[in-house]
């Protein structure tokens, strides 16, 4: 039995879960998220109202999808109650970010400013010219938008300049020795 998959997903008060035709819909104070459950996995409501994820057999695909499905459902419940946020920071002389409505404009050493618009369900917050955050209810979407922003100018290993996650340790290299 999967150690993660056998743990029931607790559903807090104020969150409504609907299971219909292999689609789980979670409604909460922050919004609504849906997830399609893969074929061998079964999701049901437990006695205490929690979501219980089970698998019919011990085949490899069933075992691999068991814990995954449970974790994805737990992420839906957390998303509609608390939401998710990724904090990023910019390191480098002259590198900065400004908010332009619902989009961000970056000055990252290119000959032009780079503009990133917020997809539906994502909000940007700029705390300072070098610190900003990406927030939303869908964990996968928040992570993907943050990764795409980081990809614009990844931290380089010699001076560490670029966009990085808050608290990220950049592996540094020693430059070539001068004469």
From Swiss-Prot:
GO MF terms here are: rRNA binding; structural constituent of ribosome
Query: Does the record's keyword annotation contain Iron-sulfur?
Result: no
**Is Ion transport given among the entry's keywords?**
no
Q: Which InterPro entries match?
A: Ribosomal_uL6-like, Ribosomal_uL6-like_a/b-dom_sf, Ribosomal_uL6_a/b-dom, Ribosomal_uL6_bac-type, Ribosomal_uL6_CS
One GO term (biological process): cytoplasmic translation
Q: Where in the chain are disulfide-linked cysteines found?
A: none
Q: Name one Pfam family in it.
A: Ribosomal_L6
Q: Name one GO cellular component term.
A: cytosolic large ribosomal subunit
Sorted alphabetically, the keyword list is:
Ribonucleoprotein, Ribosomal protein, RNA-binding, rRNA-binding
For this protein, the record's PROSITE patterns field holds: RIBOSOMAL_L6_1
The entry describes its oligomerization and partners as: Part of the 50S ribosomal subunit.
Which HAMAP family does this UniProt record tie to the protein? Ribosomal_uL6_B
- What is the documented function of this protein? This protein binds to the 23S rRNA, and is important in its secondary structure. It is located near the subunit interface in the base of the L7/L12 stalk, and near the tRNA binding site of the peptidyltransferase center.
Family membership, please give it. Belongs to the universal ribosomal protein uL6 family.
Q: What is this protein called?
A: Large ribosomal subunit protein uL6
Q: Which organism is it from?
A: Beutenbergia cavernae (strain ATCC BAA-8 / DSM 12333 / CCUG 43141 / JCM 11478 / NBRC 16432 / NCIMB 13614 / HKI 0122)
This protein's encoding gene? rplF
């Amino acid at each position: 039995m999967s150690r993660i998959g056998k743990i029931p997903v607790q559903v807090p008060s104020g969150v409504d879960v609907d299971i219909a035709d292999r689609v789980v819909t979670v409604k909460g104070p922050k919004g609504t998220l849906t997830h399609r459950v893969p074929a061998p996995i079964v999701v049901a409501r437990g006695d205490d109202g929690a979501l219980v994820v089970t698998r019919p057999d011990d085949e490899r695909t069933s075992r691999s999808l068991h814990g995954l499905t449970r974790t994805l459902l737990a992420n839906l419940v957390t998303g509609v109650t608390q939401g998710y946020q990724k904090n990023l920071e910019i390191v480098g002389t002259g590198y900065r970010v400004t908010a332009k409505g619902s989009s961000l404009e970056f000055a990252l050493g290119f000959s032009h400013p780079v503009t990133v618009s917020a997809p539906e369900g994502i909000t940007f917050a700029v705390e300072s010219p070098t610190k900003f955050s990406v927030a939303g209810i869908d964990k996968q979407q928040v992570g993907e938008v943050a990764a795409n922003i980081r990809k614009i100018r990844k931290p380089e290993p010699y001076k560490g300049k670029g966009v990085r996650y808050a608290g990220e340790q950049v592996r540094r290299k020693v430059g070539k020795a001068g004469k």
